[in-house]
Amino acid sequence: LLEEGLKAIFPEQKIGLSAEISKQRNKIAVKLITKVVGDDGIEVEAEGIDAFGGALTTIKSLLLRVSLIMRSELRPLLILDESFPAVDSSRVHLLVDFLKVLCKKLDMDILCITHDPAIAEGADLGYKIRPTTQGAKFDLISNPRK
């Protein structure tokens, strides 16, 4: 799942990611190893969620959350609250496509909170929330793609 996600969003780059998930003292521990092969063919390896920074860190965080919720006994629900600020606008459509594939393959739902119209347009169902004097008003967007 981790490598498939990275390849879907960064198809032109050679990126590998492995995760060792274990339980230590009643807490989940994750060791992430990221490998990137540069244009010169040199492989660089780093440990940690923030290895190589920016959009790569954002996507690794998403994939890690998905991996963890798939271990749950409940129907998986992934909540994403403005989770992709570092993802370049040229990659947002790839990200949305990948999220749809995840939902189908893993039989899960995603609740995505965003101000990014490109992400909102990819939704199957959308709501616009606006403040009123009586509190928040939820307006159903029947077809977010329009």
What residue spans do the PLM features occupy?
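Extended helical coiled-coil dimerization/tether regions that scaffold
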Residues: L1-A51
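Helical mechanochemical/support elements of P-loop NTPase systems and associated helical scaffolds
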Residues: L2, A55-T58, L62, R91, ...
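Conserved RecA-like P-loop NTPase ATPase core
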Residues: L6, L62, I113
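Conserved catalytic network of the ASCE P-loop NTPase/AAA+ motor domain
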Residues: P11, F52, L68-E73, V101-L106, ...
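GG-anchored amphipathic helix commonly corresponding to the ABC/SMC/Rad50 NBD signature/C-loop
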Residues: V36, G53-L78
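Conserved D-loop/post-Walker B switch-helix segment of ABC ATPase nucleotide-binding domains
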Residues: L74-R75, P85-F98
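Walker B catalytic acidic pair
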Residues: D81-S83
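C-terminal lobe/lid and adjacent interdomain/linker elements of RecA-like ASCE P-loop ATPase modules
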Residues: L94-K146
